[in-house]
Amino acid sequence: MGNEIKDFFKTYSDFVTKVTSDPSLDLDALMERLKEIDTSSNIKSARLLTAAMGLGSETGEFVEIVKKMYLQGKPASEENIFHMKRELCDIMWYWAKACAALDLDPHEVIAENQKKLEARYGEQFEVQRSEVRKEGDL
């Protein structure tokens, strides 16, 4: 690798470090932040971290199957549908763990989702409403 490329990556690496929070760089700062959140809220940090990483990982595995099926010739077979079902099971497990970590009732989370989408779309999906949202519509 030429010096110009090495210098570029060194400069970028330094930039990344400068714009990264202390808890993302330092274990002691991370532990302090975890304790701060655990003591100042109902959030259970260990469970939430597990849930967040698990949701990301398992969703990625589900997406990988879909990608291979639609873009790389993987068959839309019963075996692959079952594989996607198993990944959805894992996603649900981590979703339930996230609800527990946040002290949320899973039924209320689902009801809130329905309420949010009904407010956004009414009786029918419209592209305009999905692209241009009202203030406060997350």
What role is predicted for each listed range?
Residues M1-L88, M92-L138:
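Flexible "arm" and connector segments at domain edges
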